[in-house]
Amino acid sequence: MIGPFKKVLVITSFNEKLYNEYAHRFLKTYNWPFDLKIYSEKKFNITYKDYKVIELGQDSKDFVQRNKNRPVKDFWVDGVRFSYKVYSVIESGLQAINENTYDILIWVDADSVFHNPLTLDFIKEHIYKEDSMMTYLGRGGMYSECGFLSWNLKHKDTKNYFEDMKKMYNEDLLYKEKEYHDSYIWDLIRIKFEKEYNTKNINIGDQAKGHVQARSVLGEIYDHVKGPRRKLQGFSAESKHFNLNLKGRK
């Protein structure tokens, strides 16, 4: 018996433009033995295998419509750009909890390339604890790296966490904060739960700046090829586990 969890759901989000740019590598290398759901602001056809795109619901569309004309100087204040990810997690997470279909929800950014399968043993050792709500990659004094996030869907606080995140976006409350991108808001609500409800969470980051995923235990499993430079070279030079140039993958 690996643990009290049985079913794991992995989700990501990308549109057709991003699929053609890099997310096709995500799908072609995805080798985890868990269900994968893909969300997007608009449905489009994926010819690889039998993957289907789930169109995000009305809450996401309404948020974008209300806020699409806000001035954006940099990504720290781009609430719309990262809202698709947030609504993907909220929709899939609440559905899984309400329908009791999955025990663990994992988010992985679409600019990722997979090397080794993620096993239940690995999850038990590094990602999951029965008394913890979520797992994240902490970077010390700055916002977390949220290209990977995981939630224990059986934890008593997880549904309320999703509902609080939903409120931040449905009521545009994120625009009252110092930064509007998703990493800042995920952290904001997580810290609130830790302080107000003594919620336990798992930090698998090394508390240092930079590409924390590549340096973490997750670097053994997959490569988050984040940023223009890494996408151009096709891999993360920071990874101590892999020295693979994936630029040739189409």
Where are these regions (language model features)?
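N-terminal anchoring/stem segment of glycosyltransferases
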Residues: M1-K73, V80, Q95-T101, L153-D157, ...
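A residue-level signal for conserved active-site and pocket-lining positions in enzyme catalytic cores
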Residues: V10, V89, L149, W186-I189
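Well-ordered, non-membrane alpha-helical segments in soluble/globular domains
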Residues: N20-R25, L120-D121, Y184
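A structural signal for well-ordered alpha-helical segments within the folded catalytic domains
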Residues: H24, S83-Y87, Y180-L188
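A structural signal for short, well-ordered beta-strand segments and their strand-loop junctions
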Residues: K37-S40, I104-D109, F114, M134-Y136, ...
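GT-A fold catalytic core of metal-dependent nucleotide-sugar glycosyltransferases
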Residues: S83-T135
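Conserved catalytic core of nucleotide-sugar-dependent glycosyltransferases
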Residues: H115-H181
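Catalytic core and acceptor-binding pocket of nucleotide-sugar-dependent glycosyltransferases
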Residues: H155-K250
